[in-house]
Regions:
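Conserved short secondary-structure transition element at the edge of the structured enzyme core
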Residues: 27-40, 74-82
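Residues at alpha-helix termini
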Residues: 1, 37, 61-62, 83
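Conserved, charged catalytic cores of large soluble enzymes
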Residues: 52, 74, 81-97
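C-terminal non-catalytic regions of proteins with extracellular/luminal or membrane-system context
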Residues: 2, 11, 17-18, 24, ...
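A generic structural-conservation signal
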Residues: 7, 43, 67-68, 89, ...
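Short acidic/histidine-rich active-site segments
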Residues: 4-20, 24-25, 33, 37-47
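Short coil/turn segments at secondary-structure boundaries
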Residues: 46-47, 71-72, 87-94, 127-130
């Protein structure tokens, strides 16, 4: 395909050819296989000295052509030159802060809104109009920014405890984006939310998964928790139109929560997700994901 960039393995995957995938009988054989297959850099070998020894042995034994090593080195060095690392290897703090603190908020909001998928919309519940004067918002992900970000957001399994991230939650976005005269009431407690839903014009329940990545978050059957399914079902029993927003990085079995009046898959919408979800629910953006 003409790709001339750097190819890097995933974490520990060279060793996994021996220990997990059984595709190589030894570590030196695994190193030779990945290098010959086009991998230019191994991400974090468990022991870099062992990797170097295995690589040298494979070259001396003729398992890896020297020209392949030259190619890998050339690609890595070319990338470093393009990035200016030989001129100034340090990050510009001003540029880093500008990116992290939201120089592209408009783009992030646009991308999140356009990636949302409308899975269900019975009786044209969406978009919410000015007729919906009282809207109750609830659910474990309604006011939870880390749940909008997912795994690998600052930390491996998501935002570490004690770290604050600038952004807008769904309930904050709804409050800021609601039409004049529309009251948005956030109710965290499930029982109170069900009680208040009975006198509301609409309910927005935001459900999904906690942040996570491979390992701790692996699941043979990814599904919405029973507690969240029960919450959606109880809200539906009130007779008030229920708009369910799912925030997750993968498809989920929804069970009892699969047939609300409206169902929006918001995925992991990021720091501007609150504004983006509000844009979709209030009809400012057509969900086209």
């Amino acid at each position: 395909w003409g790709f001339d960039g750097v190819v890097i393995s995933d974490w520990d995957d060279v060793e996994y050819l021996v220990t997990k995938y059984r595709a190589a009988a030894s570590y030196p054989e695994a190193v030779a296989k990945v290098i010959n297959a086009g991998v230019d850099m191994a991400m974090v070998p468990p022991d870099d000295r062992e990797f170097h020894q295995a690589l040298l042995k494979a070259i001396k034994d003729g398992l890896i052509p020297r020209k392949r090593i030259d190619e890998a080195v050339r690609r890595v060095l070319t990338l470093k030159f393009k990035l200016g690392l030989f001129d100034d290897p340090y990050v510009d703090p001003a540029k880093a802060d500008k990116i992290v603190l939201g120089a592209d908020k408009k783009l992030a909001r646009k991308a999140a809104a356009e990636s949302a998928v409308l899975l269900r919309n019975e009786n044209d519940v969406l978009p919410l109009t000015a007729k919906a004067r009282k809207i109750v918002v609830t659910g474990p992900s309604a006011d939870n920014l880390p749940n909008q970000l997912g795994g690998w957001s600052i930390g491996w399994q998501g935002v570490p405890d004690g770290v604050e991230v600038p952004g807008t939650t769904v309930v904050e976005g709804l409050k800021k984006g609601a039409p004049a005269g529309t009251k948005i009431s956030y109710v965290a407690d499930a029982d109170k939310a069900v009680a208040q839903a009975k006198s509301a014009d609409a309910v927005v329940v935001v459900v999904g998964e906690k942040p996570g990545a491979e390992g701790e978050s692996d699941a043979p059957r990814p599904a919405l928790s029973a507690e969240q399914q029960d919450l959606v079902a109880r809200l539906q029993d009130t007779g008030t139109p229920v708009i369910e927003v799912v925030l997750a990085g993968r498809p989920l079995v929804l069970g009892k929560a699969s047939e609300p009046d409206a169902l929006l898959m918001g995925w992991l919408p990021g720091t501007e997700g609150g504004h983006a979800i509000a844009d979709v629910l209030f009809g400012k953006v057509n969900p086209s994901g």
